[in-house]
Amino acid sequence: MSYPPNQGYPPQSNSPQPGQYGAPQQGYPPQQGYPPQQGYPPQQGYPPQQGYPPQQGYPPQQGYPPQQGYPPQQGYPPQQGYPPQQGYPPQQGYPPQQGYPPQQGYPPQQGYPPQQGYPPQGYPPQQGYPPVGVPVGVPVGFAPGMVVGYHQGYFVGTITHDCKHDAEVLRKAMKGIGTNESDLIKVLANRNWAEREQIKREFSAKYSKDLIQDIKSETSGNFEKCLVALLTEPAHFDVEQIHSACAGAGTNENTIIEILVTRSNVQMEYIKQIFKNKHGKSLKDRLESEASGDFKKLLEKLTEPRDESPVINPMQVSKDAEDLYKAGEGKIGTDEKEFIKILTSRSLPHIAAVASEYIKHHKKHSLIKAIDSEFSGSIKTGLIAIVTYALNPYGYFAEILNKSMKGAGTNDNKLIRTVVTQMHNMPQIKTAYSTLFKNSLAHDIQADCSGDFKKLLLDIIS
């Protein structure tokens, strides 16, 4: 399914703006106030923001950089200053979509028993990703002031390939009669976003042509959609996905939920800025026109900053678990506002700890089951998505991919969106997929897709 906060948070600095590295595009205020993300050693003992009671069948989680650097949201006291608590599992791992380098100095929290039905997993730290913001020299093609590895809060990697040569290969693949689709796949599926952005620049500088427009004129169908997605800035891509989900008859609530639930405060702030500049209407206003009732309130809250501290306050966890019980299963009727308030404002590690606390003390079943019995429709889908993502983010994305290919036909837009936006997390997502479902992700793509589109997807996930 990656935001500078709305209030009290200074805009980012050293992060490239829409359109250009280091130079703000008209309409986007320059980011200020964040120092370059350099020199942070990997977090020791307290892996990035997760490790809450894992769900059954989910593979060991591999860490996402922690969502750090923001004070707790208004109305909630800072969750700081608590000594290491006995009774919580080691917290680790949200995908490096979150835009923060790993932090150091949090002792491990141990001993929290897993939710009933969920085996303990103690997710190890993230493996296989380059260190965030610790470049050995500045890669070719990066403008001064760019935070290497991140753009608008999204993980984009660093430039290690010869992007000028890649631009030449792409031009040759589309020049003349016919198109060499294999070369398009070979280059674009095997470069990170920072490299693909630089390839676009090199292509434009050398040939005075727009690479995306050339791709559109030379390809078609899902193959074209996926290539264009690979070449679109991450925040802009999210904006267009949300806008498309709201367009036409009906609203694709699942697309909106999958994006809003999984994006950080930094990412969400850019999504809101870009949406307003591009579509002349605030994201909040657009969502209000597409939804109603409690679901509308949930979407509004999901666009606001949530606490991103990795520190858990056990007393607040116990109180929230009790409050959720009293708001749902412990009374006649349901207090929807209480569920929305807690699940949209608390940190993801906190929510996972609440889910574990809930199962210990209330009805001996999960918070997800409680939500399922108390809610219906889109509000139920949204609340369950929050808890599921908090408990196991890689498993959450694996489930989205599986649903996109399950049953008759394939939801190509969902498949493209998830594969492209989570390609840097694919090793862990593929492991989760193989554990949760009968087949591997590659096997199911092979069975459900065809032609150059299938080849492109298989190259991306490999």
UniProtKB/Swiss-Prot annotation:
Annexin repeats lie at residues 161-232, 233-304, 315-388, 392-462. GO terms for molecular function: calcium ion binding; calcium-dependent phospholipid binding; phosphatidylserine binding. Keywords: Annexin, Calcium, Calcium/phospholipid-binding, Repeat. One of its GO terms (biological process) is intracellular calcium ion homeostasis. Residues 7-131 are annotated as: 19 X 6 AA tandem repeats of Q-G-Y-P-P-Q. One of its GO terms (cellular component) is cytoplasm. Residues 1-130 are annotated as: Disordered. InterPro entries: Annexin (IPR001464), Annexin_repeat (IPR018502), Annexin_repeat_CS (IPR018252), Annexin_sf (IPR037104). Residues 16-130 have a biased composition (Low complexity). A pair of annexin repeats may form one binding site for calcium and phospholipid. Calcium/phospholipid-binding protein which promotes membrane fusion and is involved in exocytosis. Belongs to the annexin family. This is Annexin A7. It comes from Dictyostelium discoideum. The gene is nxnA.
